[in-house]
């Protein structure tokens, strides 16, 4: 079992397409759980579980992901601590492609929040708990240097942002993606601790006058696959 500050813990991971291409979790048992929002497939080993947010069949684009089912599944399985890895574009020159950062806040204005409260008058201010991030950042160093307290800007997807959109949102945050804000919203409502890790696959469209080179983007995604495998290997060692 993983042990943190003297307490045994169970940790669930949420990741994306890089996990589908990884052999790291090939020996984990595939299971399914029913939720009020649909069935969720996940992988499990010991005290840990892994959800591929895009699914294990035909990968769902970001705007079609069943976020409520994914988070409800983890809550129903008894997990409290969630570590999420999200692919992002960098909005800052000082966060080059290949960087891993942790976000402590987010902006999600295009779609509005994800919520479980369709028939209840409930609200509250969502947070990214990041309760495991200090441990992970300290223990992953010096192999991984992970800047913290970054701001995640969420757009709907599945297309990349226009240059004009990037000019607007550069002042809003540090990285841009399509998934983390909804997960953080729902984890807050469900009482789960959401821990943010974000891996930059590219500079955002038009940053410093550049355009996205999709050939280079695909090559970097492949290169980042090795980094993702190593990151999860180390996290599993740290968390037990």
Where are these regions (language model features)?
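Flexible, glycine/proline-enriched loop segments at strand-loop-helix junctions
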Residues: 56-61, 118-131, 154-156, 170-174
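Generic hydrophobic/aromatic pocket-lining and core-packing "Φ" positions
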Residues: 71, 166, 181-184
């Amino acid at each position: 079992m993983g042990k943190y500050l003297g307490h045994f813990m169970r940790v669930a991971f949420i990741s994306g397409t890089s996990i589908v291409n990884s052999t790291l979790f090939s020996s984990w048992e595939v299971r399914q759980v029913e939720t009020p929002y649909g069935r969720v497939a996940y992988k499990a080993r010991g005290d840990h579980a892994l959800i591929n947010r895009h699914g294990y069949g035909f990968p769902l684009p970001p705007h079609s992901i069943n976020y409520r089912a994914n988070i409800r599944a983890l809550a129903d399985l008894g997990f409290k601590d969630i570590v999420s890895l999200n692919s992002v574009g960098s909005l800052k020159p000082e966060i080059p492609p290949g960087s891993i950062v942790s976000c402590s806040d987010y902006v999600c204005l295009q779609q509005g929040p994800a919520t479980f409260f369709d028939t209840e008058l409930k609200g509250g201010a969502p947070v990214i708990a990041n309760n495991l991030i200090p441990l992970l950042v300290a223990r992953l160093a010096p192999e991984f240097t992970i800047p913290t307290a970054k701001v995640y800007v969420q757009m709907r997807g599945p297309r990349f942002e226009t240059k004009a959109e990037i000019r607007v949102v550069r002042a809003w945050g540090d990285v841009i993606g399509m998934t983390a804000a909804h997960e953080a919203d729902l984890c807050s409502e469900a009482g789960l601790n959401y821990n943010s890790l974000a891996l930059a696959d590219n500079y955002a469209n038009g940053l410093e006058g550049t355009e996205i080179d999709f050939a280079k983007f695909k090559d970097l995604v492949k290169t980042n696959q090795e980094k993702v495998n190593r990151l999860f290997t180390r996290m599993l060692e740290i968390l037990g």
